[in-house]
Amino acid sequence: MSHEELNKQLEPFKLMVFDEGTEDVWATLVLWLNEDYKQNVFDTREEEGFVGNGYDWNALATVFLEEKMPELMEVLSFDSEAGMFAIGSEDVEAVKQFALGFKALCDDESEMTDLFSRATLD
């Protein structure tokens, strides 16, 4: 599957691969938080301080990795900011695997809400 096809499947997330074909290749999955994508899930814990920013997405992704893809915990790293969720690695296939699984989670709002109920505020 091409990067273009994969990105269509991952919308509104975007997978970016840098320096492809070199030993310095790396990839990152990004979600710019300029829309209300899944904000209702984060609103379920608003009273606890969750607002749906990049750090809150990190908290959700951490629970997802711990419970669904623990083998990727050591190879992925977060680089989020308040207005952006980002996770990446030099292991492009690991980022793709995470991206597909995490997007599937987001498409299942009840499972997403369940996992988010175990997230810890950073």
Predicted region positions:
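Structured alpha/beta or helical-core interaction and ligand-binding surfaces enriched in interleaved
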Residues: M1-M84, S89-Q97, A104-D122
